Amino acid sequence: MLRIPVRKALVGLSKSPKGCVRTTATAASNLIEVFVDGQSVMVEPGTTVLQACEKVGMQIPRFCYHERLSVAGNCRMCLVEIEKAPKVVAACAMPVMKGWNILTNSEKSKKAREGVMELLLANHPLDCPICDQGGECDLQDQSMMFGNDRSRFLEGKRAVEDKNIGPLVKTIMTRCIQCTRCIRFASEIAGVDDLGTTGRGNDMQVGTYIEKMFMSELSGNIIDICPVGALTSKPYAFTARPWETRKTESIDVMDAVGSNIVVSTRTGEVMRILPRMHEDINEEWISDKTRFAYDGLKRQRLTEPMVRNEKGLLTYTSWEDALSRVAGMLQSFQGKDVAAIAGGLVDAEALVALKDLLNRVDSDTLCTEEVFPTAGAGTDLRSNYLLNTTIAGVEEADVVLLVGTNPRFEAPLFNARIRKSWLHNDLKVALIGSPVDLTYTYDHLGDSPKILQDIASGSHPFSQVLKEAKKPMVVLGSSALQRNDGAAILAAFSSIAQKIRMTSGVTGDWKVMNILHRIASQVAALDLGYKPGVEAIRKNPPRLLFLLGADGGCITRQDLPKDCFIIYQGHHGDVGAPIADVILPGAAYTEKSATYVNTEGRAQQTKVAVTPPGLAREDWKIIRALSEIAGVTLPYDTLDQVRNRLEEVSPNLVRYDDIEGANYFQQANELSKLVNQQLLADPLVPPQLTIKDFYMTDSISRASQTMAKCVKAVTEGAQAVEEPSIC
């Protein structure tokens, strides 16, 4: 795959990396003066006319231009007049020159836009009443603002056959205006060259040439950037209008990136999920699982408490009965006879409440499903388990070493950042692990974990590359630590990071060592002192086990005593609920105000978008009620009080949208030398090798029919998925 040459002057494609500050004197000396409707503005050389206009607050209409994509200049809607110039110019593609006076609202500019709009509408169908883009359509808005008030077109309009590009994106290509935003997104951001144009003139069409599924984990973003109704959401088709929905700003929990989202709801139901801008995390993109798995929120839900009767069947009961049974068992067992496992979608408030409850019955056996080595520094030092360079920090790096991970499917937005830096900043990438398609070229160093020791000792050729790097990153996937030699892998990895800091030109504030987590709850659980992995429970099986959203299948009935009493608290009847003796229905992430900490250690909040179904309640409230009935009342009654408790245990958990610097790398490396360094010969194989492994990874996405359709389409082809006959 060839790298795309990029004009460095374009905003969005060449933003200065975070932390890099240009001196004021140098910048000021390079500025040139131009005028926008007579108003003076100082801009850098190479700035386009459109960017200069935006700098003074003048909005120029556009369809093909997008801040994060290369310039195409297809639509011509941004035509403006330059004083004394013979013709109007395309503002998105024309760099300004000193002394230019740009006339955005002159008669010449208006006539040019009206002409362009008339040509765009000549073949555009009058579908607005049935188009899902209605109400948020750029063509609607701009035709009202900049178009003519009458039509001169009397001939027939062209018709284009719709394309089937999978179960997520609905295509009505007669509406397409050939802006090529989707093509540029696929090629530049997603790194998948599936979309392109065929034909020319009136016969030009956008599609996949050979009809096939648009195979990308970021494919849904072409819906957002399409300025018309040519590309819309299949699951959302004909369900709601944008002005009918209530929008709630929230956080995604489908992975550990913590993408910012907007949850659109109507009549107590999630209608769709859209991205929300956050430059340091997801920019303005989200993954397909984040966007489309929401239908899993209304399927296989636990809506009422359940208990197992004398026949061994789970039956519905009241909250009073369920909590009384659990409280009675809590009063019967103490200490090591009580244990808990937290799942991947649990919020920090529920984690601290469960921790306090078990501590009050003299138990500290609190585990997570995900394993993380505790030998050496383990989880005692926060820098040992965070993505310390930060997600946005990838854009500053010059070398990235990926170990035992497939970031394309484990953390799609992190992978998109790597691709962005590879494309624009000549980033060099290397991989230790199974060869996978990462949407960018990389040096495959092998799949043996022993390569880590070779790099650490300096005997591997890539050691020299890391030594010469100014801002290197080494990224270890948490999936590589699930192995029996996870501690040795982490020790070797830590040794590489520390050696780079000592021998290369790394500055003091640059972080080299990074752990890429896969699940949303892991960092908060480690911050609160949970033990990673369930080995402690397997060695000393408890008499009472509390499963808090634990649906990873990390423990079964066979691992526990026959008389072990199991409580499951969660929102889906997935893996954990069927083995439980009592089920307490909890709330999903769209139904509660909760705290999650992403892989870089950034605390963020979800907000209540809809109420929990049936009798389900927020997790921390259930645990608080249980503690009162059990006679070990927890000292908080409100959400604010729970968060005060969070602050007592780990202050960073309530410093929202902030990253606390972690600086104990040298100490962690010294402690790692005490670890058994024996590595296994087994190759490093990430669990999500292909896109088929990406779609269904947790209880919500496994309950989603849309995600099931995606798996079927990938396996059998897009034609295998039957879609309802709709317009």
From Swiss-Prot:
<keyword id="KW-1278">Translocase</keyword>
<feature type="transit peptide" description="Mitochondrion">
    <location>
        <begin position="1"/>
        <end position="23"/>
    </location>
</feature>
<dbReference type="InterPro" id="IPR019574">
    <property type="entry name" value="NADH_UbQ_OxRdtase_Gsu_4Fe4S-bd"/>
</dbReference>
<keyword id="KW-0999">Mitochondrion inner membrane</keyword>
<feature type="binding site">
    <location>
        <position position="124"/>
    </location>
    <ligand>
        <name>[4Fe-4S] cluster 1</name>
    </ligand>
</feature>
<feature type="domain" description="2Fe-2S ferredoxin-type">
    <location>
        <begin position="30"/>
        <end position="108"/>
    </location>
</feature>
<feature type="domain" description="4Fe-4S Mo/W bis-MGD-type">
    <location>
        <begin position="245"/>
        <end position="301"/>
    </location>
</feature>
<feature type="modified residue" description="N6-acetyllysine">
    <location>
        <position position="467"/>
    </location>
</feature>
<feature type="domain" description="4Fe-4S His(Cys)3-ligated-type">
    <location>
        <begin position="108"/>
        <end position="147"/>
    </location>
</feature>
<dbReference type="InterPro" id="IPR006656">
    <property type="entry name" value="Mopterin_OxRdtase"/>
</dbReference>
<keyword id="KW-0809">Transit peptide</keyword>
<keyword id="KW-0496">Mitochondrion</keyword>
<feature type="modified residue" description="N6-acetyllysine">
    <location>
        <position position="709"/>
    </location>
</feature>
<dbReference type="GO" id="GO:0008137">
    <property type="term" value="F:NADH dehydrogenase (ubiquinone) activity"/>
</dbReference>
<dbReference type="Pfam" id="PF09326">
    <property type="entry name" value="NADH_dhqG_C"/>
</dbReference>
<dbReference type="GO" id="GO:0005758">
    <property type="term" value="C:mitochondrial intermembrane space"/>
</dbReference>
<keyword id="KW-0411">Iron-sulfur</keyword>
<comment type="similarity">
    <text>Belongs to the complex I 75 kDa subunit family.</text>
</comment>
<feature type="modified residue" description="N6-acetyllysine">
    <location>
        <position position="84"/>
    </location>
</feature>
<dbReference type="InterPro" id="IPR000283">
    <property type="entry name" value="NADH_UbQ_OxRdtase_75kDa_su_CS"/>
</dbReference>
<keyword id="KW-0408">Iron</keyword>
<feature type="binding site">
    <location>
        <position position="75"/>
    </location>
    <ligand>
        <name>[2Fe-2S] cluster</name>
    </ligand>
</feature>
<feature type="binding site">
    <location>
        <position position="179"/>
    </location>
    <ligand>
        <name>[4Fe-4S] cluster 2</name>
    </ligand>
</feature>
<dbReference type="InterPro" id="IPR050123">
    <property type="entry name" value="Prok_molybdopt-oxidoreductase"/>
</dbReference>
<dbReference type="Pfam" id="PF22151">
    <property type="entry name" value="Fer4_NDSU1"/>
</dbReference>
<keyword id="KW-0520">NAD</keyword>
<dbReference type="GO" id="GO:0051537">
    <property type="term" value="F:2 iron, 2 sulfur cluster binding"/>
</dbReference>
<keyword id="KW-0679">Respiratory chain</keyword>
<keyword id="KW-0001">2Fe-2S</keyword>
<keyword id="KW-0813">Transport</keyword>
<keyword id="KW-0472">Membrane</keyword>
<dbReference type="Pfam" id="PF00384">
    <property type="entry name" value="Molybdopterin"/>
</dbReference>
<protein>
    <recommendedName>
        <fullName>NADH-ubiquinone oxidoreductase 75 kDa subunit, mitochondrial</fullName>
        <ecNumber>7.1.1.2</ecNumber>
    </recommendedName>
</protein>
<dbReference type="GO" id="GO:0051539">
    <property type="term" value="F:4 iron, 4 sulfur cluster binding"/>
</dbReference>
<dbReference type="Pfam" id="PF10588">
    <property type="entry name" value="NADH-G_4Fe-4S_3"/>
</dbReference>
<dbReference type="GO" id="GO:0005739">
    <property type="term" value="C:mitochondrion"/>
</dbReference>
<dbReference type="InterPro" id="IPR001041">
    <property type="entry name" value="2Fe-2S_ferredoxin-type"/>
</dbReference>
<feature type="binding site">
    <location>
        <position position="128"/>
    </location>
    <ligand>
        <name>[4Fe-4S] cluster 1</name>
    </ligand>
</feature>
<dbReference type="GO" id="GO:0006120">
    <property type="term" value="P:mitochondrial electron transport, NADH to ubiquinone"/>
</dbReference>
<keyword id="KW-0479">Metal-binding</keyword>
<dbReference type="GO" id="GO:0005743">
    <property type="term" value="C:mitochondrial inner membrane"/>
</dbReference>
<dbReference type="InterPro" id="IPR010228">
    <property type="entry name" value="NADH_UbQ_OxRdtase_Gsu"/>
</dbReference>
